[in-house]
Amino acid sequence: MQIILLNDVDHLGEKGEVHEVADGYGRNYLIPQGLARVATDGAIRQLRDEQQQQARKEAAKKEQVEELKDELEDMQVVFTAKVGEDNRIFGTVTTQQIAVELSNRGFNIDRRDIELDEDIRFVGAYTASIDLGYGIEATLDIQVIPESG
């Protein structure tokens, strides 16, 4: 009998796949447990439609992430800091501070998705990599300038 998996099943397949299984396995275990349903022509058509709709949603989401990447890469974040000897700032600029600054500008980026190439301890220009998901990474320019006064 042909079935459509409603959940991932070990040693059989993943959710949404169509498989041929023994009648007893399908009727006595998979269907009663809610792991599968009988694969009728209508059910298979419905499954394909759902998969196409999901693929369109994923493509649209990925396109939004690409646009976000472009916006972030066109931006420069500037921090002012008190400076001591040798242009060394007091403290460091952290990923949390970067995330807050991006949030103030309307971007919802988690600090754990921001990776600094090096610790920001001196006045100057730095870059940070931001993992946006879907295998897309944005590079953010960061500038640290001395506090005036």
UniProtKB/Swiss-Prot annotation:
A single GO BP: translation
Keyword Ribonucleoprotein tagged: yes
Entry GO CC: ribonucleoprotein complex; ribosome
UniProt KW Ion transport keyword: no
Alphabetical list of InterPro entries matching this protein: Ribosomal_bL9, Ribosomal_bL9/RNase_H1_N, Ribosomal_bL9_bac/chp, Ribosomal_bL9_C, Ribosomal_bL9_C_sf, Ribosomal_bL9_N, Ribosomal_bL9_N_sf
Keyword set, alphabetical order: Ribonucleoprotein, Ribosomal protein, RNA-binding, rRNA-binding
Pfam families per UniProt: Ribosomal_L9_C, Ribosomal_L9_N
PANTHER family linked to this entry: 50S RIBOSOMAL PROTEIN L9 (PTHR21368)
Family: Belongs to the bacterial ribosomal protein bL9 family.
The protein, known as: Large ribosomal subunit protein bL9
Organism of origin: Salinibacter ruber (strain DSM 13855 / M31)
Taxonomic lineage of the native organism: Bacteria, Pseudomonadati, Rhodothermota, Rhodothermia, Rhodothermales
